[in-house]
Amino acid sequence: MRVGVTLACTECKRRNYTTAKNKKNDPNRIELKKYCKWCHTHTVHKETR
């Protein structure tokens, strides 16, 4: 079962990305290193609820 999730920057707390994840394979919150246009650098983005 795939669900939509929002990714927020850990530096500025802005919600920059939306993506889908498989809850069966990834039951925990995901963390991805993505580009933040507000920080102008690559930062860790965490899943928000």
UniProtKB/Swiss-Prot annotation:
Q: Which UniProt keywords apply?
A: Ribonucleoprotein, Ribosomal protein
Gene3D superfamilies noted in UniProt:
Ribosomal protein L33 (2.20.28.120)
The terms under GO molecular function for this entry are: structural constituent of ribosome
Q: Which GO terms describe its cellular component?
A: cytoplasm; ribonucleoprotein complex; ribosome
| Superkingdom per UniProt | Bacteria
Q: Which NCBIfam families match?
A: PRK00504.1, PRK00595.1, rpmG_bact
What does the sequence similarity comment in the record state about its family?
Belongs to the bacterial ribosomal protein bL33 family.
| Descriptive protein name | Large ribosomal subunit protein bL33
The species this protein was found in: Desulforamulus reducens (strain ATCC BAA-1160 / DSM 100696 / MI-1)
